[in-house]
Amino acid sequence: MSASRIRAKCFRLGQRCHTRFYDVLKKDIDNVRRGFADAFNPRLAKLLSPLSHVDVQRAVRISMSFEVNLGRRRPDCVCIIQTESSGAGKTVCFIVELKSCRFSANIHTPTKYHQFCEGMRQLRDTMALIKETTPTGSDEIMVTPLLVFVSQRGLNLLQVTRLPPKVIHGNLVMLASHLENVAEYTPPIRSVRERRRLCKKKIHVCSLAKKRAKSCHRSALTKFEENAACGVDLPLRRPSLGACGGILQSITGMFSHG
């Protein structure tokens, strides 16, 4: 295969990874809007909260735009989240540059270093452009740029880097409207038929999981009775804690120790 065809293939794979990531992030945001806090995708919950001390599950306003055309730059995603905490509102504007990785075993390679440097330049330019284009107003907005490395297979978050946030003042509503108007990608809305098919699939998976859990429980009881008859003391099992929250509460684990 020629070098040009390899580059074209890599470009297509990267594009596909971007759109899949957008779709998952959009579903997360939609779940927040509908009040389904427990319906987060576990990968997305790490992305925003720990970097800004904003609880996205308590957002009063969320605006998200993809492939935003700002002229010199086109950030992959710009997300504006407004929350209320103890009566005081807080607004964060996240700029997300996404870098997809075909091979995720080693994040420290020349190719990924080039992607990192390119992403940093893109974020700095985008911050300046957003500051220039923000309509005049009194709203305080904290602009937070994020460089996100994600694996093409599985959409696993590999590394998230945040540039120092900057506070700007402007009209929040007009800024969100402007960004939505210049966005060049909108995640597709699933048809009713497709939603029903996915719902049936989820119900089927849940029923299988319940049957499997019952089967495991029965076998565990049988094993316990056998060991008890032999006079064996079994250790108590602590219930496992499921991941609560989801790519909006996972860019948390990466920064919770920092």
UniProtKB/Swiss-Prot annotation:
Upregulating conditions: Expressed late in the infection cycle.
GO cellular component labels: host cell Golgi apparatus; host cell nucleolus; virion component
Keyword match Cell division: no
Protein function: May participate in nuclear egress of viral particles. Plays a role in the dispersal of several host nucleolar proteins including NCL/nucleolin and NPM1. Since deletion of host NCL/nucleolin negatively impact on nuclear egress, UL24 supposedly acts on this process through its effect on host nucleoli.
Protein keywords: Host cytoplasm, Host Golgi apparatus, Host nucleus, Late protein, Virion
Family recorded in the similarity comment: Belongs to the herpesviridae UL24 family.
Name by which UniProt lists this protein: Protein UL24 homolog
Annotated compartments: Virion; Host cytoplasm; Host nucleus, Host nucleolus; Host Golgi apparatus
Pfam family, one: Herpes_UL24
Entries under InterPro entries matching the protein: Herpes_UL24 (IPR002580)
Organism of provenance: Varicella-zoster virus (strain Dumas) (HHV-3)
